[in-house]
């Protein structure tokens, strides 16, 4: 087993609850950084516009695209692991880690800002 495979199997992801977004966010960000996946969550990665463009990619570009997809799917999987069933349903249609993360930020960052203002 490679070192990266070993590292990913040891990651313990805490589950987001309705009241724990701020601490969950910090922990998930750290986990995603440690797996070199944070840039996929924040920036995404370049995707072909359609299938014909993808078919025209060079071998090197095709390999890079597949590596990017694999890493983005790994990031999405880690995010999904950190959600209970009801919260998971909010991001179930997300096709990228960036999309899932943005949905969660929209749902929960606003809630934590409102709580801060109320205090």
Which ranges hold each PLM region?
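N-terminal Lys/Arg-enriched interaction segments
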Residues: 1-119
